[in-house]
A protein has these predicted regions:
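Long, leucine- and charge-enriched amphipathic alpha-helices
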Residues: 1-38, 73-74, 79, 93-95
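Low-complexity intrinsically disordered segments
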Residues: 37-97
Length: 97
């Protein structure tokens, strides 16, 4: 696996962990984080000039981190979030055909 991919995996899990902590400290709600992530995805997909020139695989790739964080946010447990491999699988299962 490419080292950059491993770095991004670690970064996404760090952000998911911070989001989890923000929710459990009562600073943000799951819904507030979900709304922010939905806005981020809409911003990415709304840039038609860039987005329309991409292949479907590249579109999925650019949205993958946001979707993974959305799933991690909505799958929060009391203390932990699911492991990266499980979250990535869940992103793949929600992908439109």
């Amino acid at each position: 696996m490419n080292v950059a991919n491993l770095q991004l995996e670690g970064f996404m899990m760090a952000v998911a962990s911070i989001n989890n902590l923000l929710v459990h400290k009562g600073l943000l709600s799951i819904d507030e984080i979900d709304t922010a992530l939905r806005k981020a995805e809409a911003s990415m997909t709304g840039d038609e000039r860039t987005y329309e020139d991409m292949s479907p695989a590249n579109r999925d790739a650019i949205c993958f981190p946001i979707r993974l964080l959305q799933i991690a946010n909505n799958a929060q447990g009391e203390l932990d979030i699911p492991p990266f491999s499980e979250l990535a699988k869940m992103v793949g299962q929600t992908k439109e055909p």
